[in-house]
């Protein structure tokens, strides 16, 4: 259910959940975009019993000032957000949060409140997935018209930059594009740091158990197929020095770590036969590794029950 109005009318929301159960369709798995301000515990319980496994919340911002400028009104209530997320997690639901950076009323200080909120929720294990967007004015909206009137749009920006996915098209005098871009990256990093805090203990325990199968002195190649904090924990828990195959950007962050011999960097993008050059493939073959370690962060396919 990919519309935020899915749960706006409480009676409809609960009736739909009951109808799903009555029709015998509660064995299926449902994901829904919901407005957290319109939810309550009873509605969440009914949804969970009907097969809902993941809720997507439009968190948007951790700043009251930005929320006011974005005219979020009653849809912005951080105490209610925390309450609903915590209760949803107690029911075993997955929580997906969407936030935006650089909107009207934002500044480095105000967007830092959003960054802090992301870290708080992730570090408590409340936030399973996140979508971070740069607040981008779309033609026809009040935001866009306001930016045009105040000459806040970069004249060099083409329409491909209006996707909110890492490109900044608005330049505030007090909050330049470079700082907005920095806040965007901080929000993504805050999620990673929070997940590391909440999951590192369990991850290390599982890693130690798995690595008992690898004899000391074995030649090991690790694929950088998980977040960098997981790679660091792998290196800490292995009894062997290893080589790493990964992307250029991750190599810069990981080089010099204890337990890491050399990094084979293939450029950018996901692992595939097309993304790795034939010369590098031949070099890896000549290394004659005893083990190739492919870390998987989601080996239970959490979040994909509906597939």
Please report, for each region that a protein language model flagged, where it lies by residue:
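Conserved beta-strand->loop/alpha-helix structural units within folded catalytic cores of enzymes
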Residues: 89, 93-98, 108, 121-124
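Active-site and donor-binding regions of nucleotide-sugar-utilizing enzymes
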Residues: 219-307
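Structural recognition of alpha->loop->beta junctions
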Residues: 46-55, 112-134, 257-269
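A structural signal for isolated positions on well-ordered beta-strands in alpha/beta enzyme cores
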Residues: 31, 56, 96-98, 131, ...
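A short, charged/proline- and glycine-enriched loop
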Residues: 210-220
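Conserved residues at the C-terminal ends of beta-strands
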Residues: 2, 58, 133, 266, ...
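C-terminal accessory regions of radical SAM enzymes
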Residues: 109-210
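Conserved SAM/AdoMet-binding glycine-rich loop
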Residues: 1-96, 103
């Amino acid at each position: 259910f990919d519309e935020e109005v899915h749960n706006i009318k409480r009676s409809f929301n609960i009736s739909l959940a009951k109808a799903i159960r009555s029709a015998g369709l509660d064995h299926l798995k449902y994901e829904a975009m919901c407005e957290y301000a319109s939810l309550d515990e009873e509605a969440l319980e009914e949804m969970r019993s009907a097969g809902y496994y993941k809720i997507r919340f439009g968190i948007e911002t951790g700043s009251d000032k930005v929320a006011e400028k974005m005219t979020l009104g009653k849809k912005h209530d951080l105490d209610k957000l925390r309450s609903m997320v915590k209760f949803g997690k107690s029911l075993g639901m997955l929580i997906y949060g969407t936030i935006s950076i650089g909107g009207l009323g934002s500044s480095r200080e105000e967007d830092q409140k959003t960054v802090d909120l992301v870290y708080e929720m992730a570090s408590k294990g409340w936030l399973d997935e996140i979508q971070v967007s740069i607040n981008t004015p779309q033609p026809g909206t009040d935001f866009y018209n306001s930016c045009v009137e105040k000459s806040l749009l970069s004249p060099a920006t083409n329409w491909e930059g209006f996707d909110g996915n890492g490109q900044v098209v608005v330049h505030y005098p007090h909050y330049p594009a470079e700082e907005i871009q920095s806040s965007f990256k901080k929000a993504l990093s805050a999620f990673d740091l929070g997940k590391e805090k909440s999951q590192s203990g369990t991850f290390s325990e599982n890693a130690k158990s798995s690595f008992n199968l690898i004899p000391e002195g074995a030649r090991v190649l690790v694929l950088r197929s998980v977040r960098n904090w997981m790679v660091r924990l792998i290196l800490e828990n292995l009894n062997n020095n290893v080589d790493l195959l990964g992307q250029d950007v991750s190599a810069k962050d990981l080089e010099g770590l204890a337990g890491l011999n050399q990094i084979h960097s293939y450029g950018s993008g996901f692992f595939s036969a097309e993304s790795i050059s034939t010369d590098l493939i031949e070099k890896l073959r000549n290394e004659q590794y005893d083990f190739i370690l492919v870390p998987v962060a989601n080996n239970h396919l959490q979040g994909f029950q509906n597939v």
